[in-house]
Each structure stands twice: as C-alpha cells, then as structure tokens.
Amino acid sequence: AEPAPRAVKQAAVRKLSDYYDALWHTLATPGERQAPGKWTPAQGVNTLGDPMEGAWWERRHYWRRMSIEELKRGPNRTGAPAMDGKWTVVSAKTEGITPGFVILDRHKRRYFVKFDPPSNPEMATGADQIAIRIFYALGYHVPENHLVRFGPEMLELGPDVTVQDRLGHKHKMTSRDLSEILMHVSTGKDGRWRATASLGLPGKPLGPYRYFGVRADDPNDVVPHEHRRDLRGMHPACAFIDHDDSRSINTIDVLADGP
C-alpha cells in the first residue's frame, strides 16, 4: 500500500477549460514520447511492479474474486435518494448536452441528478450503470450512482437557488426555470423521468485532476500522473467499454478527512 498520507494544509479548487487543455497539449506542449525501441516504465508501483492501494486505486476483483452480488452492487452502499419525501433542488445545470440539478433528499443527502439525451432515452443512464460497476471491480474509486424514476411531485425548490441563462447571467431560480429544464427531458409511458442520482462524495471537491504532472499543493501527489500505473491502466479499460469522454474535465479530486 501507499505510505500513510501527509496532511494537506491548503488545496486550491481547480477549474479546467476542456478546449484550452486539448489545444495547449496537442499543439503547444505535446506529451512525452517513448524513444524508438525503448519504453518508459510505470511509477507508483511496488517492488513487483503492481499499483499500490491508496488514494487512487485499491485491490478488488483480480486479487479477491467478488461474488455476483458484489459485482452487481458495485460501489453502492448508501442507497438511492429517499422516495418517501420531497427532493429539494439546491442548484441546477442548464449547459451541456443534458441538463441536470443537485437535490437534497429528506435525509439531507446530496445527489447529482443527470438525465439521458432526449434523442437517446436510457442510453447514458444505462451505460453509466454498467461502466461504474466495471471500474469499481477494477479497483478505481467511483461514486455511488443510482438509477431512479420520479415525477414532478417529488421536486421542490430550495431557498435562494440561482440558475444561469444562456447568456451567462444568473438569477433566482423559479418553478418556471425548473419546468423549462425538465421540458428537454424525455419521460416514460408512465409520465416519469428516468435519471442517474449520483451521491455526493464526502470531503471537499477540488475540481478535476490532470493526466500529467502533479498537484503542487498536495504533498502526497509525488508521482507524475502520466507515469502512474493505475492511470495508465485506465486507458485500455476506457477503450474496452468505448468510454471516449474520460477526459480531465470529467474527473474530480476530493480532499478527504479520513483514510
């Protein structure tokens, strides 16, 4: 396993531009290339060349065969948002291919609710349920993602919720704003919406991580990401399931208090 983590005194929240990141590192500073006939060994490994358990990865199915029930359950432990009470909308996402919002259930648990594209019902939510279990079995840290179906009676707006319009202007969110978001989401024959409810991770979100370099504000992050065996191992896994959206912008670093 990795050495015991050192305390992180201050860690900045990082925001990345997907377009800038792609253009800069494609045209300005392309990544390291292996010399002909040579290869660059992976780092962040033990004496046997295996990745070490820790903040990035841990041993699961390959080292200890998981049961069918464990594989089906994946990372899910807490459960889906409670259906016997209102979901309070505390923020909303209007940009991107699919809209979404953040809710608190009656237990005050935070979930990120994401929908399918209107043209492809069940596509994103179904693929997510499969992929999250594959990566969990491979040993990666993934969030709890639950498949939910709900109707408009489940939702209520929280106080002082703001939303951003197409011009980037923010205003207090109204019931009409919520209705306009949901107008772009397909419903089933029963009139309910199908979505993924992703449980908020414990700790302080620090934004996405990069697939190269290290975080200067994290004394535990000492192995360049492009040479980490666990991150290198993600490449064939993503290729296997055709996960072409596994970019930095879709990752997250979290500053956790416990192990």
Describe the residue ranges of each PLM region:
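Regulatory N- and C-terminal appendages and interdomain linkers associated
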Residues: 1-91, 107-108
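Short, well-ordered helical secondary-structure segments
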Residues: 3, 7, 11, 44, ...
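General secondary-structure edge motif
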Residues: 3, 83, 115, 217-220
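Extracytoplasmic/secreted proteins, especially bacterial periplasmic and envelope-associated proteins
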Residues: 11, 15-18, 22, 126, ...
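Generic marker of "main functional regions" within proteins
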Residues: 26-37, 67, 145, 150-160, ...
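Conserved ATP-binding subdomain of kinase catalytic cores across diverse folds
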Residues: 73-211, 242
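Conserved kinase catalytic-core segment
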Residues: 123-128, 209-259
